[in-house]
């Protein structure tokens, strides 16, 4: 169980600490937006004009805007972004998910 939380907790904690605006996509396709106010093993408290308790089992994707680094340097000395990809790799254009309907 602790292994599964080792990526989730630092990521959500960075979003909370830095008050990063996020979009949370639910498994039913609904998009929620706000800031992570708090979280635990089962829920995320998302704050916008109101606070919403969102159960993690209903979440498909959490998308920060802008991207957030949630960990320090890797053993090789480079810093990975939140996707864990190579920051020196050529960047591919990304399609906006709102246009893909």
UniProtKB/Swiss-Prot annotation:
How does the annotation summarize its subunit structure?
Homohexamer.
- List, in alphabetical order, the Gene Ontology terms for molecular function in this entry: RNA binding
Cross-referenced HAMAP family, in alphabetical order?
Hfq (MF_00436)
BP GO annotations:
regulation of DNA-templated transcription; regulation of RNA stability; regulation of translation, ncRNA-mediated
UniProt similarity note: Belongs to the Hfq family.
PANTHER family, per database record: RNA-BINDING PROTEIN HFQ
Q: Give the protein's biological function.
A: RNA chaperone that binds small regulatory RNA (sRNAs) and mRNAs to facilitate mRNA translational regulation in response to envelope stress, environmental stress and changes in metabolite concentrations. Also binds with high specificity to tRNAs.
**Where is composition skewed (Polar residues) in this entry?**
70-86
One GO CC term, this protein = cytosol
What is this protein's name?
A: RNA-binding protein Hfq
Keywords of this protein's UniProt record, alphabetized? RNA-binding, Stress response
Task: Give the residue ranges for region: Disordered.
Answer: 62-101
> Which segments constitute the Sm domain?
9-68
InterPro entries according to UniProt: Hfq, LSM_dom_sf, Sm
């Amino acid at each position: 169980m602790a292994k599964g939380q080792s990526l989730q907790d630092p990521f959500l904690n960075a979003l909370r600490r830095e008050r990063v605006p996020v979009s949370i996509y639910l498994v039913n396709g609904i998009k929620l937006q706000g800031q992570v106010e708090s979280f635990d093993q089962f829920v995320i408290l998302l704050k916008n004009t109101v606070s919403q308790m969102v159960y993690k089992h209903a979440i498909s994707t959490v998308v920060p805007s802008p991207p957030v680094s949630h960990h320090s340097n890797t053993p090789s000395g480079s810093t990975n972004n939140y996707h864990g990809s190579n920051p020196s790799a050529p960047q591919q254009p990304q399609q906006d998910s709102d246009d893909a309907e």
